[in-house]
Amino acid sequence: MARIRQELQSNRRMVRYLAGVLVASAAFAAGPVYEISGRILPRARASVVLFGASAPYSASTFVFPGSEFRFKKLQPGAYVLTIFIRGRGEARQPVEVGPATAGRHGRIFLTLRLKDSDFVLAAALDQHTVSAKQLAISPAARRDYREALKDLSKHNVDSAVRRLDDAVERAPQFSAAWNNLGTIAYQTGKYDRAEECFREALKQEPRSFEALVNLGGVLVTEQKLDEALDYNGQAVLARPNDALAQSQLGLTYYLIGSLDLATKHLEQAIEIDPLHFSHPQLVLFRIHLRQGNPNAAAGVLEDFLTRHPDWPWASNMRSTIVELRSR
């Protein structure tokens, strides 16, 4: 019984740590701001959205063939670029913003050479196709939603939340607004509220992959592992090439003690997106330690630091690698 209690306490610490991973990049020194710009190849008209993975943020722009996108006044942290091109679908690109990645002038320039395999077509078209239920959303609620996104682009989170609350009060079926409320709640540590919002988003739009995978994520954080296994499993079935879905399912299996299945899904997440903001390498590191494989654990950490040079605890990780290699 003591061993079980110890394992449960270890799992709770692990989940709290991994939830903190999403905001860990806020540990960078406050003050410097950064800029992301780039171009898309092959040239195409595209909608480009930048989401904050570690803190509430959203900004969007539209690019014409050959033109560049640009996002300014960014705080350090993890971001996700979403590119939607009509006829091809949706592609995502993680971006880590910090001193090492941005260089001396605080600017990151990306050349996105997008292949067909980078795009999710059917699911993206579903997402960008408005259902009859969503068409019934009032113009006032849509205006609240647009203004909330503008607030997020200016880092005005409180105002964004108020506007999103107004939007769902006017239009309770507004799934995207519920999902944004849940994302902000999760990123600010209000997990009960996040779960409530993600459940409502999924109820109002059962096809919403974002609501599905986000609900799976908060259920892991809350240690509701039976439900987490269900929802994250559904997310992987819906989009097997989604790194977040694979990473969260791997973490869920880790927490229930199914290490082989955890390893399978975490390795798939890393293969899909080795830079993913959920950092599946850190859970895989723990698995290798539990299985008594210090060299594999050290290798995972080395790979992680290569991809995340601005990680706040890089120095401690390097010391851990040296210790593991000496065993």
Task: Give the role of each language-model region.
Residues 180, 214, 248, 283, ...:
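Canonical tetratricopeptide repeat
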Residues 141, 175-176, 209-210, 243-244, ...:
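Helix-start (N-cap) detector for alpha-helical repeat units in TPR-like alpha-solenoids
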Residues 30, 61, 86-111:
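Structured interaction patches on ligand/partner-binding surfaces of diverse proteins
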Residues 153-163, 187-200, 221-234, 256-268, ...:
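Structural signature of tandem alpha-helical TPR/SEL1-like repeats
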Residues 77-87:
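A short, solvent-exposed beta-strand micro-motif common in secreted/extracellular proteins
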Residues 54-68:
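Short, acidic Ser/Thr/Gly-rich low-complexity loop/linker segments typical of extracellular
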Residues 170, 204, 238, 272-273, ...:
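Structural marker of alpha-solenoid helical repeat scaffolds
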